[in-house]
């Protein structure tokens, strides 16, 4: 996955609104192979929590990520086919063809969809820098990235002289979604954003 912007959200934020976001991105972000990294090993350095404002309390993190994800995976009986990629704006949410053979590396896309606040109030489509935002819970065919919010396991208040350790646990078990069925009879493979648990220690 490619993360291009990381922001912390102050107390009062919700899953659908990042209050007074502060940009803590390191450089231009980073690409991380999260599925192959062993526990406790650094996948990429994407944020500097030292950029947070002292004395402020933060309860959510907001991440801007590319819709394109390079994945080798399976959904039901349908597997990613090497070199058979999805797209930003094609029909069926930009889904890719799969096959029942050996899973290979393919580029899948987080799908485009019209407003769905029941399931996706934590995200909206955007550009790489988190600008040109789509409406809440909407990803447009032209959006190259999406912005997503996640609650911290506990509030974070930066203190002078403190260097917190930030743990991000990624669950990629549902990284591939089959749009219509699991027996691979149609074009239906899409990327599903990984579930992330964020813990900050050493405050």
Can you annotate each of these PLM segments?
Residues 1-203:
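A short, solvent-exposed, low-complexity linear motif enriched for acidic/polar residues
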């Amino acid at each position: 996955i490619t993360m291009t912007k990381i922001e912390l959200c102050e107390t009062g934020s919700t899953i659908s609104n990042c209050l007074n976001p502060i940009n803590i991105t390191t450089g231009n972000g980073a690409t991380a192979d999260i599925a192959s990294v062993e526990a406790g090993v650094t996948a990429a350095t994407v944020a500097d929590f030292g950029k947070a404002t002292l004395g402020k309390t933060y309860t959510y993190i907001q991440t801007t990520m590319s819709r394109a994800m390079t994945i080798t995976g399976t959904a039901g009986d349908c597997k990613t086919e090497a070199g058979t990629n999805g797209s930003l704006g094609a029909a069926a949410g930009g889904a890719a063809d799969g096959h029942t053979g050996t899973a290979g590396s393919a580029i899948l896309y987080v799908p485009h969809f019209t407003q769905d606040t029941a399931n996706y109030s934590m995200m909206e489509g955007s550009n790489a820098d988190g600008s040109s935002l789509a409406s809440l819970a909407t990803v447009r065919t032209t959006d190259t990235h999406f912005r997503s919010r996640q609650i911290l396991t506990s509030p974070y208040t930066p203190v002078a002289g403190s260097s917190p350790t930030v743990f991000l646990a990624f669950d990629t078990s549902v990284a591939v979604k089959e749009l219509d069925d699991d027996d691979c009879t149609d074009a239906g493979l899409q990327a599903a954003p990984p579930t992330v648990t964020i813990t900050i220690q050493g405050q």
